[in-house]
């Protein structure tokens, strides 16, 4: 199977082909400022199934988005709802890359909550390193929908740490006393200072 992603997504042009190396092709679709639309995703699926040869073509099995995107843009709750509807229509999981999730959740321009993401996405991950963790991300299957034998698959791909407790301890700490969000707020505050300085120099923003 394969995944649909914005042509700006890091999994499309970075990662040394890691996705393809695990036998999952990445298909890039057009984006606007890093975001893909439900309309574009629906059109891709419609065109795929309308092709008489689709049984012989690469099957689009999942939709991948980032929030915030690689451009720093944010999906609105409405946009996530629309993407979720299309994904369910075509029985394709919606996966959200949350490497920068903390920044997105505390942004003044954001209207999406963690509960919204859990409700609208089939899987997502909460990034740790961009809020100070030494390593790792927390993968979340919000509907008790983890693939069967998920841990076995993780281990088969060399991704199970011998000292895995190190990951858990970090996230336990990050989600105690709102530390995860406080760190993210500080990052946004610092970024706003930089943004203002760049704005005064005549730069424009998304």
Segments (PLM) and residue ranges:
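PLP-dependent aminotransferase-class I/II
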Residues: 23-61, 65-68, 75-82
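Catalytic PLP-binding core of fold-type I/II PLP enzymes
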Residues: 75-107
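Active-site-proximal loop->helix
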Residues: 14-24
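Active-site-proximal loop/turn and secondary-structure-junction residues that shape catalytic pockets
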Residues: 69, 100-102, 130
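Hydrophobic beta-strand scaffold residues
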Residues: 26-27, 94-96, 205
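Active-site C-terminal subdomain of aminotransferase-like
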Residues: 59-66, 74, 112-206
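Single conserved hydrophobic/aromatic residue that forms the stacking wall/gate
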Residues: 2-9, 13
């Amino acid at each position: 199977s394969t995944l649909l992603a914005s042509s700006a997504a890091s999994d499309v042009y970075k990662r040394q082909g890691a996705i393809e190396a695990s036998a999952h092709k990445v298909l890039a679709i057009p984006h606007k400022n890093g975001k893909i639309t439900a309309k574009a995703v629906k059109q891709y699926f419609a065109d795929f199934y309308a092709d008489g040869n689709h049984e012989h073509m690469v099957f689009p099995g999942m939709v991948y988005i980032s929030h915030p995107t690689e451009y720093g843009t944010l999906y609105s709750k409405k946009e996530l709802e629309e993407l979720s509807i299309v994904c369910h229509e075509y029985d394709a999981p919606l996966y959200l890359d949350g490497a920068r999730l903390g920044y997105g959740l505390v942004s003044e321009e954001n209207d999406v909550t963690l509960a919204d993401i859990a409700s609208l996405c089939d899987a997502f991950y909460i990034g740790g390193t961009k809020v100070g963790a030494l390593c790792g991300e927390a993968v979340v299957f919000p509907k008790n929908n983890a693939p069967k034998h998920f841990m076995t698959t993780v281990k088969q791909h060399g991704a199970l740490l011998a000292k895995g407790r190190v990951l858990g301890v970090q996230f336990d700490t990050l989600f105690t006393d709102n530390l995860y969000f406080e760190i993210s707020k500080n990052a946004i505050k610092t970024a706003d200072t930089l943004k203002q300085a760049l704005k005064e120099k005549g730069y424009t923003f998304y």
